[in-house]
């Protein structure tokens, strides 16, 4: 399995996101994945992570697509279909959601994500 590394996220430098299918050609590089998540996100609170995950899966065009998130601090990789994957991202990697806009562009983002994650 091929993982997508997300090096820019402080505190989650070793986190990896694998979007798509088991075919390596279908995998997204981190910049593309982050950009797709950010561009396709919609305003909301609890639904933000789910919208991002679903949009990426839909854009890949695979109904059996999944997102695998693996962190060296966890005992094993977590594989979840669709909404489960969003919950893993939103609950266990809040910095990923908080930093999308800053990571995908050198320009100041036009649309800021709502502060929906309480620390």
List PLM regions with ranges.
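Positively charged, low-complexity terminal tracts
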Residues: 1-119
């Amino acid at each position: 399995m091929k993982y997508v590394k997300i090096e820019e996220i402080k505190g989650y430098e070793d986190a990896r996101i694998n979007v798509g299918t088991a075919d390596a050609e279908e995998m997204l590089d981190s910049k593309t994945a982050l950009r797709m998540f950010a561009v396709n996100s919609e305003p909301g609170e609890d639904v933000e992570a789910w919208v991002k995950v679903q949009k990426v899966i839909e854009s890949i065009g695979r109904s059996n697509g999944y997102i695998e998130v693996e962190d060296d601090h966890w005992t094993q990789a977590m594989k979840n279909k669709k909404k489960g994957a969003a919950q893993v991202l939103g609950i266990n990697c809040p910095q990923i959601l908080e930093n999308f806009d800053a990571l995908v562009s050198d320009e100041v983002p036009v649309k800021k994500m709502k502060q929906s994650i309480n620390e």
